[in-house]
Design a protein with these regions (language model features):
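Glycine-rich nucleophile elbow surrounding the catalytic serine of serine-hydrolase chemistry
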Residues: 108-120
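Mobile cap/lid helix-loop segments that gate and shape the active-site cleft of serine hydrolases
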Residues: 65-73, 88, 127-173
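Alpha/beta-hydrolase fold nucleophile elbow
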Residues: 98-110
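Conserved hydrolase catalytic core segment
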Residues: 121-127
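Cap/lid segment of the alpha/beta-hydrolase catalytic domain
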Residues: 1-84, 141-144
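A structural signal for short, well-ordered beta-strand segments and their strand-loop junctions
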Residues: 35-38, 130-131, 176
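Conserved dinucleotide-binding and phosphotransfer motif residues
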Residues: 30, 96, 123
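Alpha-helical segments flanking ligand/cofactor-binding loops in enzyme cores
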Residues: 25, 117-118, 168
Length: 176
């Protein structure tokens, strides 16, 4: 989204935003069942926002930052909430008649790509994962002054692990 938190599912579904992000319809046209939820802090899950217009004074960013900070200060993290929501969505998706539970995959770009990495390492139902624009180590980001996506701020993770270890923890059929 290029920090465009006012977009979420609508961009992936091809309704607004960059056509390069509209992979949902392409997958659906090719026979995939596609579920595109708004992640917390994006589009319809933003605080004090409705629709796809950005909030003034960069409030979409500040709301996202606050959401991360409040969770870290209370001993939690934003990625945990995103993963809980995503795993619940996968449970609901897998209950739909015609959905092959053995062939559930996940695809994401940027923050979605980070979510793919964590989700595919933790949820055994995922048989395919494709993370785009996200496989950059914490060490590389810090050494080169590259931003760290807010949901990837997981207290104490960097002391023990690196982002790329998430792919090693998976039993995936395919990783792109």
């Amino acid at each position: 989204h290029n920090s465009e938190r006012h977009f979420g599912k609508s961009e992936v579904c091809g309704i607004v935003g960059s056509p390069y992000q509209a992979f949902g319809p392409v997958l659906a046209r090719n026979g995939f069942v596609v579920l595109v939820p708004d992640v917390i802090c994006f589009e319809e899950r933003r605080k004090n926002a409705h629709g796809i217009e950005p909030l003034a004074n960069d409030m979409d960013f500040w709301n996202h930052l606050n959401e991360m900070c409040y969770r870290v200060l209370s001993g939690n993290c934003l990625m945990k909430k995103i993963l809980e929501d995503t795993m619940t969505a996968i449970t609901l998706l897998s209950e739909i008649p015609g959905v092959d539970k053995s062939r559930i995959g996940t695809l994401g770009h940027s923050m979605g790509g980070n979510t793919v990495q964590f989700l595919s390492a933790l949820d055994e139902r995922i048989s395919f994962a494709c993370a785009s624009g996200s496989a950059c180590s914490y060490k590389n980001r810090m050494e080169n002054g590259v931003g760290i996506e807010l949901a990837s701020v997981v207290p104490n993770l960097y002391k023990k692990y690196e982002i790329h270890i998430l792919f090693w923890l998976t039993n995936l059929v395919s990783v792109c």
